[in-house]
From Swiss-Prot:
Belongs to the rodlin family. GO terms for biological process: cell adhesion. Induction: During aerial hyphae formation. Expression is activated by ECF sigma factor BldN. Its main location: secreted. The N-terminus of RdlA is more highly charged than the same region in RdlB; replacing 3 charged residues by polar residues confers the ability to form amyloid rods to RdlA and allows the mutant protein to form rodlets by itself, which neither RdlA or RdlB can do alone. GO terms for cellular component: extracellular region; spore wall. The lineage of its organism: Bacteria, Bacillati, Actinomycetota, Actinomycetes, Kitasatosporales. This is Rodlin protein RdlA. Probably forms part of the rodlet layer on the spore surface; despite their high similarity both RdlA and RdlB are required for rodlet formation. Plays a role in cell adhesion to polystyrene plates. Does not form amyloid fibrils in vitro, unlike RdlB. Keywords: Cell adhesion, Cell wall, Secreted, Signal. It comes from the Bacteria. It comes from Streptomyces coelicolor (strain ATCC BAA-471 / A3(2) / M145). The keyword Oxidoreductase does not apply.
Amino acid sequence: MLKKAMVAAAAAASVIGMSAAAAPQALAIGDDNGPAVANGNGAESAFGNSATKGDMSPQLSLVEGTLNKPCLGVEDVNVAVINLVPIQDINVLADDLNQQCADNSTQAKRDGALSHVLEDLSVLSANGEGR
């Protein structure tokens, strides 16, 4: 009885292992074209559409609609520790993206810079991908 259970468990484990081995592997291959950008793809915005009703309920007339989406585009700034040692964030594993204050926009990153180090190895590269 125990032998039959062990045989069934081993067979199930081998089937699961074979299906996992046959599944496509997620490798960083091929996507060298840079970030893909789509701006305002079917998006709509409405500003200044607030209303207050009743006595003594004023609107913010000077800034009405401008506080809906405040946006301050600030570049990366080097920060000095006690004004002695400048510290800078250098992206090694990822690419820089400088899309700030882009309303209704999407920027899809490409594969990271160091993800293509092993690209030319035949075991890890695009075997039969048809570049």
